[in-house]
């Protein structure tokens, strides 16, 4: 079976912003995403969004070009204003046409 290398971008964001982020991922070129409820604590042990729904973990498998667009969007429109975590992992996928 042929496998292709792609990037898995994982973003943990306040639930109130999840739909906006999901839309931005699509605009950036992501073909899909998975969103799940998440909870935890960051380096400051602060949870600003407990009242309005907690956090959501949004993940998408993308190519390098789409990843760059997503990271630029996060850096410009999210990181300066919101409590958000983001990391990128190298993954291998089957059915590459889906990503």
Roles of regions detected by a PLM:
Residues 1-99:
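Positively charged, small/polar-rich N-terminal and surface patches that mediate targeting and assembly
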